[in-house]
């Protein structure tokens, strides 16, 4: 299946619970020029409420979409407000995903190697009135 690349432009959001019962929130900005900014926030919770932010990492790099394959190349990371260049020889900075669903509201994709499935929701700046 072939997906329209323009559908990915903009801001996306997802949250999950990891295997250590921590909340992981991802904010993604995918730009038309092929650049991305992903921010991952790991949060300790207690009784469903935020207890403390454990980690916040921002990744910067390039992305693309060919047919039903979405790929990312991380080039920089921001940790504790410090910008670091990543090792481009490290295969962990390259990821490919099969797109399962993509429309104006939802982006669902599966990692090619790990088979993990992620589902993001589009963040809209415009609130419609009825």
Residue ranges and their predicted role:
Residues 1-66, 71-130:
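Lipid interaction determinants
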């Amino acid at each position: 299946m072939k997906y329209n690349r323009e559908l990915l432009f903009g801001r996306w959001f997802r949250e999950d619970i990891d295997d250590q019962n921590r909340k992981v929130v991802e904010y993604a900005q995918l730009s038309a020029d092929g650049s991305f900014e992903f921010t991952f926030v790991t949060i300790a919770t207690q009784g469903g409420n935020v207890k403390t932010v454990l980690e916040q990492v921002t990744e910067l790099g390039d992305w693309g979409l060919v047919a039903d394959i979405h790929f990312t190349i991380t080039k920089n990371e921001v940790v504790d407000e410090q910008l670091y260049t990543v090792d481009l020889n490290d295969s962990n900075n390259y990821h490919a995903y099969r797109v399962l669903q993509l429309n104006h509201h939802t982006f669902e994709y599966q990692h090619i190697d790990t088979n993990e499935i992620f589902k993001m929701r589009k963040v809209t700046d415009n609130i419609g009135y009825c």
